[in-house]
């Protein structure tokens, strides 16, 4: 019995010394239609137990994420199952299932990116339109210390999306807005090759459209100064689609 207690105490001590804690991430769907959020863990780490799920209008769901953790979240729209294969018209992850199983969203997709620190250290989080836009989204913290400001892209970017960036549905409505990188695959838009630094890859007329609509969100790869947010002390997070 004493040996069991000693081992339990050692395990508990190692747990706290390692800085392990679990952050709660709550997803809320304020959109008028059902969405299918997806999750992707970065850095070749194991995926979360739940990599995709259905979320009805006005519904919420909470996932626990063990720190340290880094990854992204998005929502798929207009999804259907035909002949046993699940597909979505925007932000599909191409698994044929609701679960994304380590696949990311096919652009365009509005993203929430979170880097949860160990030792209750400084987390980083953002809303990113680097891969384009499909839905309004926000992320806010609960608890934590420091700045801990909410960030969002609340605008309907689809309404002002240039024709050359538009993704249209079968009914001719604009479902999503591509990034210039996705649309044209040119290094000056993708910040690659000779354009792979902040100095050589400035904002473009296309990224400025995203920035004008959503000033807090990343509009292209080097849009860090106004788009990255921080919070320390092991906060929880609330991600709201159509805030």
From Swiss-Prot:
Keywords: Antimicrobial, Apoplast, Disulfide bond, Fungicide, Secreted, Signal
Superkingdom assignment: Eukaryota
Disulfide-bonded cysteines: 31-242, 79-88, 93-100, 148-231, 153-214, 161-177, 181-190, 191-201
Pfam families: Thaumatin (PF00314)
Cleavable signal peptide: 1-22
InterPro entries: Osmotin/thaumatin-like_sf (IPR037176), Thaumatin (IPR001938), Thaumatin_CS (IPR017949)
SMART domains membership: THN
Name of the protein: Thaumatin-like protein 1
Protein family per UniProt: Belongs to the thaumatin family.
